[in-house]
């Protein structure tokens, strides 16, 4: 299960940024090139495990886009991207997000009360971005059928549980100076 993803993670280079061990991977960074077979493996797996009875697939700019786009193409479900810049459209919702290494503002367009979405993201670590997004969607009256993260690192997903959301993390990892270690694979019992 998810052999390409697991192999690519274990073989990811790790660099030190201050005290933080940072892994570099095509899904989280777009570096090196993203192998279409890797994207296909991930998309096929998500289709198997996620509630895809939705109006739209929702992702966050930028690195959630490749996987969400593949899902959209495979399922025929429209794709909505939460952007990092405003478009000043009617109904646009602004949200502040904070991660372990940055703060910013995101903008939701094209969603309304009663819409059903599946959220797909590349990585969850601190949970700051997804936490802000889930809160905003709940306040809008948007129904979240599932939250999917390709890669999980750390315990940030616990924050989502406080909002009644149980994310599905495909592969949970630990990163040290020695490299990336696989901790868990969703559905691998």
From Swiss-Prot:
Record key words, sorted: Cytoplasm, Glycosyltransferase, Purine salvage, Transferase
Subunit structure: Homodimer.
Catalytic activity: IMP + diphosphate = hypoxanthine + 5-phospho-alpha-D-ribose 1-diphosphate; GMP + diphosphate = guanine + 5-phospho-alpha-D-ribose 1-diphosphate
Summary of the knockout phenotype: Cells have increased resistant to purine analogs 8-aza-2,6-diaminopurine (8-ADP) and 2-methylpurine (2MP). No change in growth rate in HS (minimal) broth.
Protein name: Hypoxanthine/guanine phosphoribosyltransferase
GO cellular component: a single term: cytoplasm
Domain of life per record: Archaea
GO molecular function: guanine phosphoribosyltransferase activity; hypoxanthine phosphoribosyltransferase activity
Pfam families per the UniProt record, alphabetical: Pribosyltran (PF00156)
Gene: hpt
Pathway(s) of this molecule: Purine metabolism; IMP biosynthesis via salvage pathway; IMP from hypoxanthine: step 1/1
PROSITE patterns: PUR_PYR_PR_TRANSFER (PS00103)
Functional summary from the UniProt entry: Catalyzes a salvage reaction resulting in the formation of IMP that is energically less costly than de novo synthesis.
Biotechnology: Used for negative selection when transforming this organism.
Keyword Cytoplasm found: yes
An individual GO BP term: IMP salvage
């Amino acid at each position: 299960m998810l052999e390409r993803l697991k192999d690519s993670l274990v073989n990811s280079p790790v660099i030190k940024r201050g005290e933080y061990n940072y892994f570099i991977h095509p899904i989280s960074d777009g570096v090196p090139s993203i192998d279409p077979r890797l994207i296909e493996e991930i998309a096929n797996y998500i289709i198997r495990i996620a509630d895809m009875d939705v109006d739209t697939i929702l992702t966050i700019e930028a690195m959630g886009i490749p996987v969400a786009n593949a899902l959209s193409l495979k399922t025929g479900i429209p794709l909505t991207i939460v952007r990092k810049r405003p478009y000043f459209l009617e109904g646009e919702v602004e949200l502040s997000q904070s991660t372990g290494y940055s703060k910013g503002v995101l903008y939701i367009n094209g969603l309304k009360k009663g819409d059903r979405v599946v959220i797909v993201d590349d990585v969850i670590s601190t949970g700051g971005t997804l936490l802000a997004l889930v809160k905003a969607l709940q306040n809008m009256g948007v129904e979240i059928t599932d939250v999917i993260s390709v890669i999980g690192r750390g315990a940030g997903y616990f924050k989502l549980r406080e909002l009644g959301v149980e994310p599905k993390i495909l592969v949970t990892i630990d990163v040290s100076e020695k490299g990336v270690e696989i901790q868990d694979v969703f559905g691998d019992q």
